[in-house]
């Protein structure tokens, strides 16, 4: 960016924060494009509080993706329905957009066995003990946008009866905790593969979330064998 600022190079790729901090000498044109970088909320499916997919889905339903895109990324991002670039040829219209739905989230939480306690926080009885839906969101403190994203998600969850809080970590601590599975929720960012292979994210052989699903593994394997674009899309939709 400093070289671009000094007009020593003609082209630079940057995020929104850099472009608001550095202005090149002379005229410059800015062209927006959708990259393969995906920011996401990661769940630790190994822990009791997040082992039920209905709980995870409820949390997802509470997130206002459009608000994050508009107010944190200054509309220089696009809310994705799933882990595929919205501009990719593989993208398809689900019709069911992922919009914030507090009522739907509440129904899912109750279906999963959670009930609001006297303080309005969801909890349940498990093995004779009270399990409270108190969740830590860890985030790398080096990224202002991801910190703000974590804080907005925290606020949305708190409003809905989930006692969420944010812990800002150094890059070293953050990577250590995510890599060792020492987290509940985390704000992550990854670059999706050009061939749209989602194995690193959801394959049972190894992912950060402890997620395992034999049916998903079968679909991922099929993605690697089919060649026609129509067949690949059909497997992806499955």
Pin down the residues of each PLM region:
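Short helices/loops that flank or line small-molecule/ion binding pockets
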Residues: 1-8, 24-25, 53-54, 151-160, ...
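Extracellular/periplasmic solute-recognition and catalytic clefts
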Residues: 1-47, 58, 70, 185, ...
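Small-molecule pocket liners
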Residues: 37-42, 82, 87, 207
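Append "and occasionally in soluble cytosolic enzymes with long acidic Gly/Pro-rich linkers
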Residues: 51-155
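A local structural motif
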Residues: 1, 131-137, 155-169
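Ligand-binding "clamshell"
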Residues: 20-32, 180-183, 195-207
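Extracytoplasmic/peripheral linker and loop segments enriched in polar/acidic and small residues
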Residues: 69, 107, 159, 163-174, ...
């Amino acid at each position: 960016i400093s070289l671009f600022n000094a007009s020593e190079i003609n082209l630079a790729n940057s995020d929104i924060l850099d472009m608001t901090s550095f202005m090149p000498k002379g005229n410059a044109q800015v062209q927006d494009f959708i990259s393969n970088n995906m920011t996401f909320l990661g769940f630790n499916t190994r822990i009791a509080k997040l082992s039920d997919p209905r709980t995870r889905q409820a949390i997802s339903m509470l997130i206002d993706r459009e608000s994050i895109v508009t107010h944190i990324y200054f509309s220089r991002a696009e809310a994705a329905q799933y882990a595929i670039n919205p501009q990719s040829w593989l993208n398809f219209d689900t019709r069911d957009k992922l919009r914030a739905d507090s009522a739907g989230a509440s129904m899912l939480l109750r279906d999963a066995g959670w009930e609001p306690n006297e303080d309005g926080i969801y909890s349940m009885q498990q093995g004779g003990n009270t399990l409270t839906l108190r969740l830590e969101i860890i985030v790398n403190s080096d990224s202002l946008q991801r910190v703000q994203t974590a804080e907005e998600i925290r606020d949305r969850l708190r409003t809905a009866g989930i006692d969420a809080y944010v812990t800002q970590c150094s890059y070293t601590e953050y990577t250590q905790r995510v890599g060792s599975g020492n987290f509940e929720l985390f704000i992550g960012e990854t670059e999706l593969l050009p061939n749209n292979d989602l194995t690193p994210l959801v394959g049972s052989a190894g992912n950060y979330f402890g997620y395992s699903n034999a049916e998903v593994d079968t679909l991922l394997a099929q993605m690697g064998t089919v060649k026609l674009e129509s067949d690949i899309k059909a497997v992806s939709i499955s």
